[in-house]
Amino acid sequence: MGYKEYDEYGTRLLEYDDNNNLIHSKEKCGFEAWYEYDDRGNQIYIKDSDGVEHWREFYNSGKLKSEHYKDSKEEYWYEYDENGKTLKGKFMYFPKKLHQAIITY
């Protein structure tokens, strides 16, 4: 069933699942974040009230396999091998007045 508690300062409400994984936080200022985990307890998704999203996928060993990050200013994707070396990456930057910049390696 999980549980809820306030942080040590009383400014943020934290909600946990049955495995003690943080699944939701809400600050007094209104900022919120939601978290998801895979079967092994790895944090695989984060979304917040500012529009930031971050996805992650892990190897069975627990090492990071890929990640995707997106907010209003940039977006990137990376893939890694089992040793943590970057295999593929793509970064997009969204400047306000310029055209979109894409960097792939």
How would you name each of these model-derived features?
Residues 5-7, 26-28, 69:
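Sterically constrained small-residue positions within well-ordered secondary structures
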Residues 25-26, 46-47, 67, 90:
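Tandem-repeat architecture and repeat-register "anchor" residues
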Residues 1-21, 32-42, 53-63, 75-85, ...:
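Aromatic-rich beta-strand edge motifs centered on tyrosine
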Residues 29, 50, 71, 93-94:
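A generic structural motif
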